[in-house]
Regions:
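The conserved Walker
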Residues: 1-2
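Hydrophobic positions on the alpha1 helix immediately C-terminal to the Walker A/P-loop
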Residues: 5-9, 13, 40
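Cytosolic-facing regulatory segments adjacent to core modules
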Residues: 19-134
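Generic enzyme active-site microenvironment
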Residues: 32, 140, 180
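Switch/connector loops and helix/strand junctions flanking conserved nucleotide-binding motifs
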Residues: 36-42, 53, 147-150, 186-190
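Short secondary-structure boundary/capping segments
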Residues: 44-50, 155, 192-198
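Helical hairpin unit composed of two closely spaced alpha helices linked by a short loop
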Residues: 122, 126-167
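Phosphate-binding/switch region of NTP-binding enzymes
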Residues: 162-214
Length: 214
């Protein structure tokens, strides 16, 4: 249930941002390690139909091969597809296995399409210049605990490397990162909750707390 909730919160954040700011140059890079891109888009379409037309269609109904939709519902689906087409260049979903290397390669590759990497005068630093200074780039990893460790690397090491890459890109390229991560279900965490200490700390996170500190 918690897993579904955090994905739902992330998806609604994306929906709200794109829906409310159609004129802004916003790029979402979404690494969905739990849900397929088709399912995410279906959920976005359902949100749009409900808010725009007041029509309630579940994503299971939308994706079903057996469900026969009414002509009215089909018409609203077609209208909603037009909105999905509008945001297709703003929301880039990757739902395949993720390693630290593929994470860095994908994000930097897209940034190269939206700007230019150059070396500093002394050749010691890499600099980045956006093509559009007003562009917002937001990277979401849902969730980072499902990354795949490279050979010889532990899950913690892989997540820590992803976090290190994110910090470097954040500082160099002005990119925002949302690393969704599961909490530990240990006794100390439960004791803290009983004392109404509900704010998350690095010790509460599963696999590694470095994502919190970074």
């Amino acid at each position: 249930m918690i897993t579904k909730l955090k994905s739902a919160v992330a998806l609604y954040m994306i929906y709200r941002t794109l829906r409310d700011n159609p004129e802004k140059d916003i790029k979402y890079i979404y690494f969905s390690l739990e849900l397929s891109s088709e399912l995410l888009l279906a959920k976005l379409m359902c949100l749009y139909m409900y808010e725009e037309f007041g029509i309630v269609i579940s994503y299971t109904e939308l994706m079903s091969w057996e469900e026969i939709l009414s002509d009215e519902k089909y018409e609203y689906i077609q209208k909603s597809r037009a909105w999905l087409s509008e945001i297709s260049e703003k929301l880039l979903i990757f739902d395949k296995a993720l390693t630290a290397k593929s994470f860095y390669r994908t994000v930097k590759g897209l940034l190269s399409e939206w700007g230019t990497f150059t070396k500093s005068a002394d050749g010691r630093r890499e600099l980045y210049q956006k093509d559009n200074p007003d562009q917002y780039v937001i990277v979401v990893v849902d969730h980072v605990g499902l990354c795949v460790p490279e050979t010889g690397s532990s899950k913690k090491q892989e997540i820590d490397t992803i976090s290190q890459y994110a910090v470097g890109l954040r500082e160099r390229c002005q990119v925002s990162f949302f690393m969704l991560q599961q909490e530990n279900r240990n006794s100390s965490n439960m004791d803290r909750r009983k004392m109404d200490m509900t704010e998350c700390s690095s010790e509460d996170l599963k696999d590694t707390g470095n994502t919190y500190n970074d």
